[in-house]
Structures are given as structure tokens and as C-alpha cells.
Regions:
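Residues that mark the start of a beta-strand
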Residues: 2, 18-19, 103, 115, ...
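Binuclear metal-ion centers of metallo-dependent hydrolases, dominated by the metallo-beta-lactamase
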Residues: 4-8, 81-97, 174, 191, ...
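Pre-active-site segment of Zn-dependent metallo-hydrolases
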Residues: 6, 10-51, 56-61, 131-176
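Short hydrophobic/aromatic beta-strand or adjacent loop that forms the aromatic wall/cage
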Residues: 8-10, 112-115
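Active-site beta-strand termini and strand-to-loop segments that position acidic
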Residues: 13-16, 99, 118-121
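Active-site neighborhood of phospho(di)ester-bond hydrolases with catalytic His/Asp-centered motifs
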Residues: 21-25, 40-54, 70-75, 126-130, ...
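Active-site environment of divalent metal-dependent phosphoester hydrolases
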Residues: 27-30, 49-54, 77-80, 95-97, ...
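Active-site HxH/HxHxD metal-binding segment of metal-dependent hydrolases
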Residues: 33-97
Length: 250
């Protein structure tokens, strides 16, 4: 089983029997086309409607081949980014789906859409989508019940409530499992101080076979490697991605 980095939060997981594509946005190095030519069923996941996690170009792949199953978050349809007939499966938080090859759980997010648990061929995979403790840098100055104005987000935010929501989502995930063979999770330096906090809180609560950073394209590959210090403390393997198209054995 291999995992290939496409771009941003996009990955291709190839198993013995199938190919899974997560959160395709851009493919600057032509990583995906060779996978579409393989004689295996393809499953395409999009966690939410944001343009950096969903690109309607994925539907063009149907013209190239048969055997593609589209598994999309319902918020994509709600925000009119796709028609109901575009996807084979629409899922919201709490929904599940299986075809005997894949077993899929749609979990919550602290932003839009869902995060994914996928079980296939004896492996349990987690793709976080936009689930994260996004306002971590505001926590040191936060007071319970009070909001802080963020120029970046142009809104009043409540970092303590947001963190509580995030930890609540992790608690919901633990009701299903406490371990993953692979975790793909946002390590985004744009958050500022504390940008690894969400990842650290996750590995404190779950056994992780391999931690894979994502959502770091704006701050660079090396910014994501900051998380390795914390995975090393727990003897969790960390994938130091260095380029698009890079592949790791799972």
C-alpha cells in the first residue's frame, strides 16, 4: 500500500485492489493521471466545498474511464458546487457507507464539511479535511466567554470555544476508534504560534502508525516538519514530504 502526495491536502492512496484520491485541488506535476490509467476501481473523496479541497475537474475523470465512485461531503451540494447526480455518495457528519471494499465514516470538522475515516484491506486511514484547532495562537490571551477580533479572519472569534469544539470532535472520533495506521492532518504555519497544537492534541489521544502533514502549501514544506519534534517524542513515524509526487510505503 502506498501514499502519494499530490498538493496541499491532496493525496492518492493505492492499495492492492483500489485507488483512493483525497481532496484534489491542483496537480501541478501531473501526479494523478497515471493512477487513473490503472485497472483498479477509483474512489474520490472531497471533505468540503472550499476550493482548496474540492475541484469540479474531478468529474472530468469520468470521461477518461469507468469505475470511479465519488464520495463527497454534503456541504458541497449545499453550497451548489456540484449537482446531486455528480456524486455516487453524499455524506454528512455521522454518516457511514460501505461497498464491501471500503468502509467509510464521515466525522466532524471545526470548519466546513467532514473528516474521513476509511478502512480498507486491513488499514485504518484518517484524513482530517479542515478539522483543526485553527485559533490556537489566540489562546494565551483568551478569556472564557469573551471574543477576540481577528484582522486575518475579519471577525470576532472565541478561541476557547473553538478549542472545546475541536476536542469534542476528537472525542466523537474516539467513539469509533482510538488508533489509525495513517493520519493526514493540517500543519499550517499560517496559523502562527501554536500551529502544531491541533496535531499534538490528536496524537495525545490516538495511536498513530504514520503522521502525514498537509495544508502547508502557503508556508512551505519545512514548516510542516516542525511537527516531527512532537511525533518523535511519542515514537510516531513522520513523513517529511519534500515535493509533489513523493510516495511512501505504508
Amino acid at each position: 500500500m502506498t501514499l502519494t502526495y499530490v498538493f496541499h491536502s491532496g493525496f492518492v492512496l493505492e492499495t492492492e485492489k483500489s485507488i483512493l484520491i483525497f481532496d484534489y485541488w491542483l496537480d501541478l506535476n501531473g501526479v494523478v493521471p497515471p493512477f487513473l490509467k490503472k485497472d483498479k476501481p477509483v474512489y474520490v473523496f472531497s471533505s468540503h466545498f472550499h476550493e482548496d479541497h474540492f475541484n469540479s475537474d474531478i468529474f472530468e475523470w469520468r470521461k477518461q474511464r469507468e469505475g470511479i465512485t465519488y464520495i463527497l461531503s454534503k456541504d458541497i451540494y449545499k453550497h451548489r458546487r456540484a449537482s446531486k447526480e455528480d456524486a455516487d455518495v453524499w455524506l454528512a457528519k455521522g454518516s457511514t457507507w460501505s461497498d464491501g471494499t471500503l468502509y467509510v465514516w464521515a466525522l466532524g470538522s471545526t470548519d466546513s464539511g467532514v473528516s474521513w475515516i476509511v478502512e480498507t484491506e486491513g488499514k485504518r486511514i484518517f484524513h482530517a479535511g479542515d478539522l483543526n484547532n485553527w485559533y490556537a495562537r489566540f489562546l494565551p490571551e483568551a478569556e472564557p466567554g469573551e471574543t477576540i477580533y481577528s484582522e486575518e479572519f475579519d471577525e470576532d472569534i472565541d478561541p476557547i470555544a473553538h478549542e472545546k469544539q475541536y476536542l469534542g470532535e476528537l472525542k466523537d472520533i474516539r467513539k469509533i476508534t482510538d488508533s489509525f495506521d495513517v493520519v493526514m492532518f493540517p500543519i499550517d504555519g499560517r496559523i502562527g504560534n501554536g500551529y502544531t497544537l491541533g496535531g499534538r492534541q490528536l496524537i495525545e489521544r490516538f495511536k498513530v502508525g504514520l503522521f502525514v502533514p498537509m495544508h502547508f502549501v502557503a508556508s512551505g514544506f519545512e514548516s510542516a516538519w516542525r511537527m516531527k519534534e512532537f511525533t518523535d517524542e511519542k515514537s510516531i513515524p513522520f513523513w517529511e514530504i519534500t515535493k509533489e509526487g513523493e510516495t511512501i510505503e505504508i
